[in-house]
Swiss-Prot record:
It comes from Crucihimalaya wallichii (Rock-cress). InterPro entries: DNA-dir_RNA_pol_bsu_ext_1_sf, DNA-dir_RNA_pol_su2, DNA-dir_RNAP_su2_dom, DNA-dir_RNAP_su2_hyb_sf, RNA_pol_bsu_bac, RNA_pol_bsu_CS, RNA_pol_Rpb2_2, RNA_pol_Rpb2_2_sf. It is an enzyme of class 2 (transferase). NCBIfam families: PRK00405.1. DNA-dependent RNA polymerase catalyzes the transcription of DNA into RNA using the four ribonucleoside triphosphates as substrates. This is DNA-directed RNA polymerase subunit beta. SUPFAM superfamilies: beta and beta-prime subunits of DNA dependent RNA-polymerase. The gene is rpoB.
Amino acid sequence: MLGDGKEGTSTIPGFNQIQFEGFYRFIDQGLIEELSKFPKIEDIDHEIEFQLFVETYQLVEPLIKERDAVYESLTYSSELYVSAGLIWKTSRNMEEQRIFIGNIPLMNSLGTSIVNGIYRIVINQILQSPGIYYQSELDHNGISVYTGTIISDWGGRLELEIDKKARIWARVSRKQKISILVLSSAMGLNLREILENVCYPEIFLSFLTDKEKKKIGSKENAILEFYQQFSCVGGDPIFSESLCKELQKKFFHQRCELGRIGRRNINSRLNLNIPQNNIFLLPRDILAAADHLIGMKFGMGTLDDMNHLKNKRIRSVADLLQDQLGLALARLENVVKGTISGAIRHKLIPTPQNLVTSTPLTTTYESFFGLHPLSQVLDRTNPLTQIVHGRKLSYLGPGGLTGRTANFRIRDIHPSHYGRICPIDTSEGINVGLIGSLSIHARIGDWGSLESPFYELFEKSKKARIRMLFLSPSQDEYYMIAAGNSLALNRGIQEEQAVPARYRQEFLTIAWEEVHLRSIFPFQYFSIGASLIPFIEHNDANRALMSSNMQRQAVPLSRSEKCIVGTGLERQVALDSGVPAIAEHEGKILYTDTEKIVFSSNGDTLSIPLIMYQRSNKNTCMHQKPQVRRGKCIKKGQILADGAATVGGELALGKNILVAYMPWEGYNFEDAVLISECLVYGDIYTSFHIRKYEIQTHVTTQGPERITKEIPHLEGRLLRNLDKNGIVMLGSWVETGDILVGKLTPQVAKESSYAPEDRLLRAILGIQVSTSKETCLKLPIGGRGRVIDVRWVQKKGGSSYNPEIIRVYISQKREIKVGDKVAGRHGNKGIISKILPRQDMPYLQDGRPVDMVFNPLGVPSRMNVGQIFECSLGLAGSLLDRHYRIAPFDERYEQEASRKLVFSELYEASKQTANPWVFEPEYPGKSRIFDGRTGDPFEQPVIIGKPYILKLIHQVDDKIHGRSSGHYALVTQQPLRGRSKQGGQRVGEMEVWALEGFGVAHILQEMLTYKSDHIRARQEVLGTTIIGGTIPKPEDAPESFRLLVRELRSLALELNHFLVSEKNFQINRKEV
């Protein structure tokens, strides 16, 4: 909440609202809009007419529940029914039926869709808004060339440009351009109409040559000239109806369809009053655009800023789903046409039911959710990740930019982003600046623009209510907007005279009386990720960016803990993520256990199932723990059960632990982190991870594959965990190499491998003897753990195309270990370098050993000083048993407000606990601490405190890898690369130089031959290792050298080479 009751209030909107509003707009408007475009379909003889009656459409409630859809790998969707009629024109009879058109995937309470059992989310795209944009570029002579670009609704472009002789050209492609007179004539105007409708007719007349007059003498001539230039055809084309249709389809429909947004933009830019339903480009638009272009040439008018948000539009979930529905209905139209003509050809009587199939709609949506770049698998690492994913804005995707072609200006922060797109939160790497995040209060308007709320200020009495306005980027340019650092909501109570404000893309300092609007909230400019960083105003923006990305990578811990120092947004994030179970009605708890909570409400008994050990797609563990007791009365909205990484309905991603900023024997050099063994034995940073292993059974040409426990040639210990069906038992502890599912695949053996009696049977009776090969599901390296769930999914119609799938879920308990990555909330990340015994860790004056030692050199150069404030305030909070929620930019209250708050709390903590070392006036915030090994105090006082530290998903167990044996690439005969393929480490050019520098010739030779691509030497090494003996030295060239020779031969170059004998130094020439 913001403000008090008298002045008017503002609440933070729901974080999933963007997705919900988009889907609602699709169901409410887009669905009817697309269905109403479905044309009436007639047969060739015009005897039968098929049409849809849109008004009667119906979406049926899904037959299955969300949870079952995930469990059985199905799509959570609704069936769409529409009334259709078949009219026989000869007898004027009409047959009407309610037909099933297809399934439309629904959105659940998380703002996501479930497709084939997988949570998927559609992210919003930022595109150039359709309309006209004026720009200028310098040509090779340094003269400004003015252009006007008309962008259509489909992204097609038509450029108008004016040359130094003031002639205007329309550029239809990169190479071809035609006169604007020809284009206007081809669109149906004659010369008199053109000259009557422009402001500068004399300029149009000035470049009208005899040749031009001939071209625009008639509409047919103009169309032929235009077609010749547009299609780049040689010779003299002849005017025909088909040529007109082709031009209409290829040019006017694709490049000139503006849509309602484009029509609105062109009307406002060119001061036209053409009706909104006229969504195509008209000759009047072209002439008005040309007039504007001439004005630009003579210094009138302003150029457009292409990166301003008023020139962008948001393509939301609604638009993407509507486009797909249009595509599906176009496919359905073709199917209906084909079926009608087929029925007439075979003299069958069609009905609406058998004309329509549900395949086009269902497959279109399944392929959209599965393949479209803007439809992504929901990242469910922790509750914050789930929410942030749906609020992303992407410049990438169909019709947008690519990571390689986007320039720096597009990626940069623009003043119009203020309060709409977060200036901090973006991805790192090639997509930096192209994938952004919505600010907390931003919303998508009706015209696809991003809107931000502001308070309107009044001159009147203090009793007047404050009014809140949502402004689009084009509207807020005309207002003086104060930057939200003033406390008062009304002008009358303002103390400061001059305030920083924003006006027309500039940041100014103006008198308070001149302000029109003010920001409503300190968080207004930031995304959710950046808003969770306390003291963000004391951090460098690059580090804040890293922090907002790293909080999304935090692993939910087995015992979560609230942060002592937060920003106040933690509760809202947890509630909107849908992770905790929340009471929808008030009532009384009747029964609770780990699986469900039962309570009575208004005489009804309701049961709420809890999530138990569910796997997220990042292998983290989703689990709900009940927080209410039997017999307790609950209110609506109360927390019934906490989910992963939430405590008491608040986000809890990490732990508050005791940290010292000091160097320790070089073990925290370059961002390494030293930790105490208490964090391991106390299960402070222990997390559970659930991995999924699956196997499919197919029907092969030799017969079906079998799931069985009877697997020949395998040791009994590998099969010890299987039940009688050949599937691993629940609760088993499994190690690397154990069989999880026993499976045999039938195969026909070769003649030579038959036993004599089999050969006899085959010769006498012709019986085909088949053998089986084991294709069991084995537990890979690093997968050891406890089996917590086994699912046998059998799809309907068990054909070979729908194989049975067996999924085994294994839970791992992972303590923190050397190589794991930890991070604070200020971009201060590091890798665990050593785990020290608790007695060796530095300890405080009250005898407590610290839990973690960070390098103090990580603070000054990186300018993320917020961590020092958080660290000291966390210590005070832990001693006073207080939690702090601090909004950013608290310096607006007074100078040095953050420092004063921290010092006052430390002083109070030292007084209440009677520990003077907590706040020592000579070096406030620091304390003298002792070396655990010697008991001596360190030379200098050290900053100690309790910051909130997260354990990230980048864990050493997922990354560490070694190759003993594995596959080789077919062409180069070198080991494959990557952990997943059991690959090797590449010894590159620089590594070879390093080994040469050390003079380790034998090791280098091994790396370049035996261990890499010397085929014969590899086999000899295997032999000598088995029988014992000295390993022979390779004498000829390795395979990569032979490959080089072959590639040179393919270029007709022969490379001669010689082998020098090591014994007698004789040159021996060999053919490769």
